[in-house]
Amino acid sequence: MKLLFKQRLFSWFDSYDIYDENENTVYVVKGQFAWGHCLKIFDASGWEVGTVKQKVLTLLPKFEICEGDRCIGYISKDLSLFKPKYNIDFNGWHVKGDFLEWDYTITDAYGRSVASVSKEIFHLTDTYMLDIQDPADALYVLMFVLAIDAEKCSRN
């Protein structure tokens, strides 16, 4: 399954659509004013399906990933000197790659690819693609990608 989003994606108090490869809206993301970043994810029918919330009283950036009312995992930035590194606390997932260039991979505990994230260059505006192996993981992958970008945006 592939999910696509356009350049204007990460605007904190705006809403934007996440598309499938046929440009059908799959999710809608809405930024919410809160202490720290907070994004609510809705399915195409308008039902809230997930939330990405920044934990504010932490030394390094950390985000809570929730499905409905239940916290299912965390992603945090690790201390590193040159390249950003992140730690995912969910199903044994790991993330590695070049986060600054939007080219990274999420793998499971056995090293198998869960998803890859890349920047598409053949579009009029910057378009980002999530290539997700199992459609059942689409919401989870999207929420972790949103958290990584939230951390990147807060540095700029």
Language-model region placement:
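Intrinsically disordered, low-complexity proline/glycine-rich segments
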Residues: 1-156
